[in-house]
Amino acid sequence: MKKKLTAADMHDPQVIAETPWFSMRKVGIDVAPGERRDFYAIHYPRPAVGIVAIQDEKVLLIRHYRYLIDKVVWAIPSGGVDEEEDPAVAALRELREETGWQAQRVEEIIRFNPSYGSSDQLFITWLATDLRWVGMDAD
């Protein structure tokens, strides 16, 4: 039977790389008696947000190139939460920056960890309704 891992099985955490947005950590994990393996994970100090914007029964998506996967994808507006920023405010900011639309109403849908096998990033998804066009910023 496979051993159920707990926090007590984790030892010697180390930050091995750091950026302004995340850090990479290494931790020793006791996977069996006398057997310790190194595990690597990405730590995000702040959550990311996404916003599902609905107007006239249609979902607003953005289309953009993602260099990490070398593909053009359809996605909901999303991005990181700035330091000291409220996640709802961040979601509304991302909606405006990426689409030119502003929402009059926003409510949290779900919080989840999309890559829990390799990172601790928290992703908070919001529902935006009562949209109005305010235009894209010049930059």
What are these regions (language model features)?
Residues D12-G50, Q55-D56:
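Acidic, metal-coordinating catalytic segment for phosphate/diphosphate chemistry
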Residues E84-V89, E98-R105:
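Beta-rich strand-turn-strand
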